[in-house]
């Protein structure tokens, strides 16, 4: 029998995490930044087992003095995770997390097709190119979609912001048409990845920033990858229950092992919960 999926909450001392990572030179990025996702990737793997708490999301409320909550989906309950950490984790790892306060709840195992849910996801909406892509004239430095690329072409295999890819692939005669929006491009990107599992009925780009990610290089050391960091909020309808369960467990998109791609579920807003699916048929088509 397959173990139930659990939602895990683990309190994290963000200051202690930064010190722990600094001693190991983990998460440092070009320009002196710090990628807490890579630090947490290593900390969680060494404390609970590789890939066990994944996907995950770290939430740090303002004014909490560096105390955060890490949420993750896992096929192991809190008691078993605590037992594993006490057996194998070094003492310095347990100074970063509050192991006694680790908590869990079992997730439903019988999702109903058509059920409406609110969601929030921190995503890295990128596309890996299957062929080279030119940056295009006038799309390098400045404030345009390709700002910061220096006008250089992208090579096959490059990981590129989905919004930038969409902007560069637009037909020349589309210049006078409706301008692309980052929100609509990212909504389409998410809809593609949830196809079959869920249908998006509303999507909002709640926040966006550029994010410098520290990742293992081909040789010893690390490389810095710049990319989008988007917080998407909205509502969905469950499609295939098994596919939806898998989307929760595995996460959505790339960099799922580093703090991206976790679907956190929320209540549907009361006004929208009262609507019939047919009332929003046209709205779904826009996402």
Label the predicted regions.
Residues 1-287:
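RNA-interacting cores
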